[in-house]
Each structure stands twice: as structure tokens, then as C-alpha cells.
């Protein structure tokens, strides 16, 4: 669903932020 898509994108962005720190 759309919520799953948004959650997936959010997790991807969060993972990228963790890698940058």
C-alpha cells in the first residue's frame, strides 16, 4: 500500500543518514 511505500522510503533515507554520520 501507499503507507508501506512511504515507510520503505523513510527507512532508506534513515539508513543513508546513519551511513553519513
Swiss-Prot record:
GO terms for cellular component: extracellular region. It comes from the Eukaryota. GO terms for biological process: defense response to bacterium; killing of cells of another organism. Expressed by the skin dorsal glands. It is found in: Secreted. The modification Isoleucine amide is found at residue 21. Keywords: Amidation, Amphibian defense peptide, Antibiotic, Antimicrobial, Cytolysis, Hemolysis, Secreted. The keyword Lyase does not apply. The keyword Secreted applies. Belongs to the frog skin active peptide (FSAP) family. Ocellatin subfamily. Has hemolytic activity against human erythrocytes (HC50=14.3 uM). Has antibacterial activity against the Gram-positive bacterium S.aureus ATCC 25923 (MIC=64 uM) and the Gram-negative bacterium E.coli ATCC 25922 (MIC=64 uM). This is Ocellatin-4. It comes from Leptodactylus ocellatus (Argus frog).
Amino acid at each position: 500500500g501507499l503507507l508501506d511505500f512511504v515507510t520503505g522510503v523513510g527507512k532508506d533515507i534513515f539508513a543513508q543518514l546513519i551511513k553519513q554520520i
